[in-house]
Amino acid sequence: TLNDGTKDGQLIIVSKDLKTFVKAQDVVTTMQNAMDNWDSVKTLLEDISIELNAGKLKSNTFDATLVHSPFPRSFQWADGSAYVNHVHLVRKARGAEMPESFWTDPLMYQGGSDDFYPPMSPILLPDESWGIDMEGEIAIVTGEVKMGTTSEDALSKIRLIMLVNDVSLRNLIPNELAKGFGFFQSK
């Protein structure tokens, strides 16, 4: 997504070698618009990508400092802690026991999704004592997944697989969770 100063940016298609891009405006204007109309735009976007990578389109030079995250904001951010060893270590670091059920029933929380950082922007923190921690994670973007969808059927709902940097303020987490209402400031 090209950071054009708007809240949702402008969808672009980047070449596989990360050297060139074209705007997708003739098909859709934003990544969210692409998700909302996936069945009708997926093939069109794929065709543009094929032509771009074959050198058949007039393109612009890609500069990673000019892009935003694919979704500058989104409707939902649900983070599942599927790496149980990591959950165990993080809980141990803050003096919390890990329930046995986490081995079979993964921990999940709903995080903020109203303002994601661009990939090349600095992460500014007013006070380092808050304990900034960054985790490389895998993000799965889906279409609509109705309640009761089977695991097998859920696979067909996957639209994108992305890498994401999840930022936590580890030293704020214990006091925040002690309030019994979950993450707000620390994630």
Segments predicted by a language model, with ranges:
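N-terminal non-catalytic cap/leader segment that marks the start of a structured domain
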Residues: 1-107, 112-113, 129
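Glycine-enriched loop-and-adjacent helix/strand subsegments that border the catalytic/binding cleft
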Residues: 74-187
